[in-house]
Amino acid sequence: MEKLGEDFFTKPTLMLAELLLGKIFVHNTGDGRCYRGKIVETEAYLAEGDEACHAYRGMTKRNRPMYGSPGTLYVYFSYGCHHLMNIVTEPAGVAGAVLIRAMEPIEGLEDMKRNRGLERTVDLLNGPGKLTRAMEITLSHNGASLSGDTVFIEKREDTAPHKICSSKRIGITKSTGLLWRRYVSDSFFVSGKKAGKAC
């Protein structure tokens, strides 16, 4: 199975937030299980001019992966209860990342349901903390490269046409006016209200 390489992720963060929609994220757990989900919602974060970005005030031990190679995972623990998964963008040394907010489940549904304690497929991955729990993404994946065999994005075209919309990001208190959330308008698997405008 071909994977997207580093050249795909070395793009402006806002562009990548849109290009990732429809792409398939894969997590091979190493014990024979595989999780696959189609990305349907993202948010962009940039160090320059974005107070909601973890790297707004510069590099720290926590946000160091954001300055690394594009196509690296930046996973952090939020409010002591959720892991959130971001994909590092921009050239190395420039802090930017795309938060994966929601996916459509494709493979590993029974394990996802067990991990979440839910039966409704539509609710399994419709939130950034929900999808990491369902797909077993933890701090152990922080700094992992998407060019390996454990976590990666499939290199294939999404043949199903979809309308992409933008809106304000969800759950932040700074730089709230930026329309840096992207989502597939007709997806039932997005995390928040489908309020926004077409891109």
From Swiss-Prot:
Gene Ontology molecular functions: alkylbase DNA N-glycosylase activity; DNA binding
CDD domains: AAG
Keywords of this entry: DNA damage, DNA repair, Hydrolase
InterPro entries reported for this sequence: Formyl_transferase-like_C_sf, MPG, MPG_sf
SUPFAM superfamilies: FMT C-terminal domain-like
GO biological process: base-excision repair
Disulfide bond residue pairs: none
Enzyme Commission code(s) on record: 3.2.2.-
Pfam families hit by this protein: Pur_DNA_glyco
HAMAP family for the chain: 3MGH
PANTHER family: DNA-3-METHYLADENINE GLYCOSYLASE
Family, per entry: Belongs to the DNA glycosylase MPG family.
NCBIfam families for the chain: 3mg (TIGR00567), PRK00802.1-3 (NF002003)
Name this polypeptide is given: Putative 3-methyladenine DNA glycosylase
